[in-house]
Amino acid sequence: MKKRRQGPINKRVDFLSNKVNKYSIRKFTVGTASILVGATLMFGAADNEAKAAEDNQLESASKEEQKGSRDNESSKLNQVDLDNGSHSSEKTTNVNNATEVKKVEAPTTSDVSKPKANEAVVTNESTKPKTTEAPTVNEESIAETPKTSTTQQDSTEKNNPSLKDNLNSSSTTSKESKTDEHSTKQAQMSTNKSNLDTNDSPTQSEKTSSQANNDSTDNQSAPSKQLDSKPSEQKVYKTKFNDEPTQDVEHTTTKLKTPSISTDSSVNDKQDYTRSAVASLGVDSNETEAITNAVRDNLDLKAASREQINEAIIAEALKKDFSNPDYGVDTPLALNTSQSKNSPHKSASPRMNLMSLAAEPNSGKNVNDKVKITNPTLSLNKSNNHANNVIWPTSNEQFNLKANYELDDSIKEGDTFTIKYGQYIRPGGLELPAIKTQLRSKDGSIVANGVYDKTTNTTTYTFTNYVDQYQNITGSFDLIATPKRETAIKDNQNYPMEVTIANEVVKKDFIVDYGNKKDNTTTAAVANVDNVNNKHNEVVYLNQNNQNPKYAKYFSTVKNGKFIPGEVKVYEVTDTNAMVDSFNPDLNSSNVKDVTSQFTPKVSADGTRVDINFARSMANGKKYIVTQAVRPTGTGNVYTEYWLTRDGTTNTNDFYRGTKSTTVTYLNGSSTAQGDNPTYSLGDYVWLDKNKNGVQDDDEKGLAGVYVTLKDSNNRELQRVTTDQSGHYQFDNLQNGTYTVEFAIPDNYTPSPANNSTNDAIDSDGERDGTRKVVVAKGTINNADNMTVDTGFYLTPKYNVGDYVWEDTNKDGIQDDNEKGISNVKVTLKNKNGDTIGTTTTDSNGKYEFTGLENGDYTIEFETPEGYTPTKQNSGSDEGKDSNGTKTTVTVKDADNKTIDSGFYKPIYNLGDYVWEDTNKDGIQDDSEKGISGVKVTLKDKNGNAIGTTTTDASGHYQFKGLENGSYTVEFETPSGYTPTKANSGQDITVDSNGITTTGIINGADNLTIDSGFYKTPKYSVGDYVWEDTNKDGIQDDNEKGISGVKVTLKDEKGNIISTTTTDENGKYQFDNLDSGNYIIHFEKPEGMTQTTANSGNDDEKDADGEDVRVTITDHDDFSIDNGYFDDDSDSDSDADSDSDSDSDSDADSDSDADSDSDSDSDSDSDSDSDSDSDSDSDSDSDSDADSDSDADSDSDSDSDSDSDSDSDSDSDSDSDSDSDSDADSDSDADSDSDADSDSDADSDSDSDSDSDADSDSDSDSDSDADSDSDSDSDSDADSDSDSDSDSDADSDSDSDSDSDADSDSDSDSDSDSDSDSDSDSDSDSDSDSDSDSDSDSDSDSDSDADSDSDSDSDSDADSDSDADSDSDSDSDSDSDSDSDADSDSDSDSDSDSDSDSDADSDSDSDSDSDAESDSDSDSDSDSDSDSDSDSDSDSDSDSDSDSDSDADSDSDSDSDSDSDSDSDSDSDSDSDSDSDADSDSYSDSDSDSDSDSDSDSDSDSDSDSDSDSDSDSDSDSDSDSDSDSDSDSDSDSDSDSDSDSDSDSDSDSDSDSDSDSDSDSDSDSDSDSDSDSDSDSDSDSDSDSDKNAKDKLPDTGANEDHDSKGTLLGTLFAGLGALLLGRRRKKDNKEK
């Protein structure tokens, strides 16, 4: 806004070309500047926000807005009293609501350049709350910003589009406007400014800083922002030296008559424009026409835009060879303007005019997204007593809009951001929003210039170069706003108030109450305060309450103001909706009619009264709106009264009810008067002063990108610009006065000497302002432009410091020619304050240098290299050769300093000692102990890198030489045959052993204490004896001799063979030269001998240790490892070839009582894989009544692949309890093919103790028909201990055709507990037809401990009938392969009472591969109680056709514990009807690495009722395909827990065809030890009677062999006859039963 200079109030200054011809507001201010009460934007820290220079306090209200009038008014006012014309005073509460607006001027910010703005708020007369409105940011544009020559230019161009005046007018001016950092900046500095661009661009924009200091232009830095360094507490300055910013020209004061054109203009207008633009370049008329014609010829003027014409002018102008240096150009965008300043008023050169064409205004981009808004709030500045969500706008209540912000460092000068107001809110308070505002920093610097657009209700802020000068800019907003009366028109209506700051939205609802009292005849309010035009706009509603006065006169008076003639209007209301509550009626609508001419308002000569005679116009109900404007004239409150009376006076009581007055109060106001203010320009030039003389020389060029700030006499910032490409700058629209111009000192530049010439136009005016990084110059405007304020800078000279770091080998402190530099030494440079400003390292030659240093004092510090020591300093007289030490001070004074050097030397030492043989192993060197020569010693640095290797000398000494201080590692290699002695024994480090690896430290001295001791490693022997243990007791007896030639193998603990030997003739063996450790000794069993019992007795040196013995040698020999063997008892080798065809009929009656106690401990590890394919067809008819109590614990892991076709019919009742723990590791490959046909009748009673190892291959084909009745009583006690490790791969294909007819009656009660782990792959095809009727009663409890390994291959054809009673203790190892085809028909009745206790502990590891194919037809009925733990993997494919008829009544109590892990894929179709009561505790832990593809197709129809409690642990992987059709009908009633003694009489009809008839009666008690390997195919007919005793003969019974044979034969015959008779009798008895 423009301020008029001080002068006579009534002086009229004519409309001069460079003066503002407008009625300014409150001109001729008294020492202070005013600010519009509007949007206030404050920058800086939130707790210390900057305030605008002036605070305006406005208080406004209309009478009807006053709280008192909002309540019921007094009875006096409720009636119309036409006779009472007296007015009420401001303080009368009962009469009117008055609003008082008080404007407060800040005491410290008077501004000679900006007139004061009048702030206004209507105050109710009776109550005058003094509400202070937050100050606006920009006094200039808010109070009043005359449009100066911009408006004139626009107007001129619009009204005179074809003017062709001379473009070189000496009175025109132009103002530069800068946009983007990378666009060209060009300003026209002289009074003669030629402007072809008629666009009015905004003023310079700027941005705030969070730093609260006044040095807004203190520093100016490099062209681009230092994004890598953003200190939060320090301003970073930036200078744009080498940029070519695009100029944005704002033509604010120009009288160019250049026609204004657009694309749609005519060709003639465009040609006139071209001619005028070319003329502005200052060329003669010939050249003007030539360029104009060239543009016309080369360009389609009809379609060309103004920009295209400008480009064509530039192109043509550049083609001409101008001799005039004023318009000669190098390039259109890089002008070199170097000219002497001979006149204080410089005209813009033709080259600058050409630049104007090339640099059209280029506005920046919107950066709303880079303005970060936080904590936005919208609150009410309440000054009356009402609800918090209600605002009284006519009482000058306002909204406070606050927010914090942060500006992104990428924002450039010319960029913009917006504050958008919503539909029902606008900026400012009672005053109209200012068109132009300024955003200032906390220290008053201009950060951005704002322009308010009423159409879009948006303020757009354009950043100034402040954002280029500083980084990390933060601050806060504090604005005021008010309801928008054009849209928020109703009282007591809720409106959403919304404002968008950048991209951040703040929104809140408020109720708006303007206080329109519709029951009053007169209601008035101040609609707004127009500070731009210095007036108050008032609105009066007449006859709003339909009182319809018969005769009325309206008049209004004002104090401290004058009514503006021509602005008093009268409108007749045709629609009452026009009388809006907001006192902002739309006077252009059809709801009102302008009837001013009918009533002719009269304004008094002094302007303080207006009269309107309505006469009788209101009598018929017409309503009127009166609008009037008041211009303040004094410093007091503007007080306006409104009257509607009969006679137009205040002398009667004939006044009508209504508002009587409003008051606008100004505090610290000033008088105003109308007039025009001349304005001028100030500026000049910033140049590069190459010769540093402070005077502009012809060859010295301008400096671009220098920040220039203009301040008033109170040091308040007014404007800021940046020098253009030619170094020029200019400030426009300035009034007379003295100003301060601040130039920011660019980085790496120094200000030139000031005032070094008597010619002010060419010398440098800027002087350094203390420690601030600015130079300051004064500029005075006295009725003319001042274009002499310039300043020069020169590049700050830089110097270098450095020298040399060397190794001072002779330690004399002086550099010698043969001494070399040390590389990579760290050197640090510090300033006089001790701050590090540079760090470097020496190069490969030891050189270093710091460059670019200014004059001053510095400190240089050298870091001592590792392993070096600083040499002595300042030796000798040659400063260039001595050492300055590790820290020295250097002064730079207009020259380089290359004498700062430092020397270091490297001290070296020795490390070593001694390696000795520590014969007594005490870890200390004794005098008698000697050194060990030839020991390898390795030296390593601290990083583990080997740096030296040596060996001990003849005396055991070693040494490493030439070592620097530091830590080293010494490693001793253990000599062959030696062992390291113990380390660090005793207190004397010089004689102890440091071990084989130790650390040696050198610290300024030799270290000769690193030694190591070793002693010879002892060797040991192991061995003893292998003997024949004739008495088999496992203990060496004196008479038992050694066995020679036995192979003994020595292995390490991992089983690797170390050595092998054999026993000598005495059975002795020995292994020597063994170290301490763990070993395995293996004895290979001599052929034909058996391992004796191991570890018998208590004498380890006398017992046998077994075949594999683990031995630990610990510092001593071990001669206790021996083993014994004995010969096998019998060795039989039989080769029998027998072909027998026997037909025997035997009737045997045997009664056997067997009591067996077996204790079996087996360790088996088995791995079996079975694949079975079975096809079964089962037809069962069972009648059973079972009461079973079964306790089963099963753990099964099965992997089976079976395909079975079975037809089985079985009836079994078994109760078995077996506890078996087996560990078996078996690997078997059995291929058995046996064909046996034997017919034998043997009766043998033998008691044998045999240990046999049989390898037999038999092929037997037997056909037997036996009818036997046997009663046997056997008592057997078997104790076998077997440990089998077998790996079996069995591929068996058996084809068995068996036809048996068995009639058996068995009743058995068995209790078994089995734990089985099986993996079988079998392929069996079996066709069996059995009809068995068995009745057996057996109670068996068996405890068996069996260890068997059998390998048999037999081919026998035997038909045998045998009755045997045997008591055997057998340990057998058999491998059998048999193929048998048997057809037997047996009828047996047996009564057995067997009591067996079986405790089996087996650990089995078996790997078997069996392929079995079976076809079985079975009919079975089973009742079993089993506790089984099985691990099976089965893959079965079964096709089962079962027809069973079962009627079962079962009471089953089963407790099973099952742990099963199964992976099955089954497809089953089952129809089951089951009633089950199951209590099961199932813990399933399956780690099944089994690939089970179980495809099960089953069709089963079963009806079962079971009560089972099962706990099973099974792991199964099954693949089964079964088709089962089962039809069972069973009716059984059985209760079996029986121990029965069965006497059976059997009649057997046996047809046997046998070539041999053998009758043998053998009673043998044999203890045999046999090892047989037989392969026999025998067809034998033998009759033998033998009695064998391998070692000890049986007691003589008194009978010879013949008697024995005969007795046996006769006994047999009689026994057979008796058995036959007995069998027939029993059979008969059974039948009768």
From Swiss-Prot:
GO terms (BP aspect): cell adhesion
Subcellular localization(s) per the UniProt record: Secreted, Cell wall
Pfam families registered for this protein in UniProt: Big_8 (PF17961), Gram_pos_anchor (PF00746), SdrD_B (PF17210), YSIRK_signal (PF04650)
LPXTG sorting signal (motif): residue ranges: 1594-1598
Sections of the chain in a coiled coil: none
Tree of life domain: Bacteria
Region of interest (Type I collagen binding region), residue spans: 679-1129
GO cellular component assignments: extracellular region
Propeptide residue intervals: 1598-1633
Function: Binds to type I collagen via alpha-2(I) or alpha-1(I) chains.
Name under which the protein is recorded: Serine-aspartate repeat-containing protein F
Species of provenance: Staphylococcus epidermidis (strain ATCC 12228 / FDA PCI 1200)
